[in-house]
Amino acid sequence: MSRRHSAKYKIDRRVGENIWGRAKSPFNKRNYKPGQHGQNRRNKVSDFGMQLMAKQKLKAYYGDITEKQFAKTYVEAARMKGNSAENLIGLLESRLDAVVYRAKFVPTVFAARQFINHGHVMVNGRRCNIGSARLKPGDVVQVREKSRNLALVLEALGSPERDIPEYVEVDPKAMTATYKRVPALADVPYPVKMEPAQVVEFYSS
């Protein structure tokens, strides 16, 4: 689990947006960056600054994954055929912790990683405790039977804050989620605008 878990909503203020679209975010009340004069900062941002912010925002959205892991994901996306920006989104969305979050089995990406680490999730009938594990289309994720009545699971399933995307098919009775296909950027229900093309520019420049 990320060391930033206890301060995850400070990330919203750091990047200047409520990136998870949650009502609990302090950014809803103080919509400026941290610091005494945060609300007064209106400096023009350079191209590099915009690219850096795009990278930080996307990296933070997926549970503030480490720079090393995020850069490795970019390198993999750049080596794949097709558009590197779209490839990057596809790789991030195919992470097990992302799919558990999309399926609404947990309330946050941070909770998804912890939930997986604690052995509450199976993939294709086998327990998996690696949040960064990569899923393939057709893979089935299931919450273990003994974990289905945990408070955070019930909270997430009943939350109106998020919709389940079309590329994840959920059976709420069996507590399964089938990863149907690799999504395009336009398919992903980000609460804020993500700019993976800027991320590509950051790493390739």
UniProtKB/Swiss-Prot annotation:
Keyword Transferase: no
Keyword rRNA-binding: yes
Keyword terms: Ribonucleoprotein, Ribosomal protein, RNA-binding, rRNA-binding
Domain of life: Bacteria
CDD domains xrefs: S4
Any Gene Ontology biological process: ribosomal small subunit biogenesis
UniProt-recorded Gene Ontology molecular function terms: rRNA binding; structural constituent of ribosome
InterPro entries noted in UniProt: Ribosomal_uS4, Ribosomal_uS4_bac-type, Ribosomal_uS4_CS, Ribosomal_uS4_N, S4_RNA-bd, S4_RNA-bd_sf
Domain S4 RNA-binding: 94-157
Pfam families registered for this protein in UniProt: Ribosomal_S4 (PF00163), S4 (PF01479)
GO cellular component, one term: small ribosomal subunit
Self-association state and partner proteins as the record states: Part of the 30S ribosomal subunit. Contacts protein S5. The interaction surface between S4 and S5 is involved in control of translational fidelity.
Similarity comment: Belongs to the universal ribosomal protein uS4 family.
General function of this protein: One of the primary rRNA binding proteins, it binds directly to 16S rRNA where it nucleates assembly of the body of the 30S subunit. With S5 and S12 plays an important role in translational accuracy.
Protein name, entry field: Small ribosomal subunit protein uS4
Organism: Hyphomonas neptunium (strain ATCC 15444)
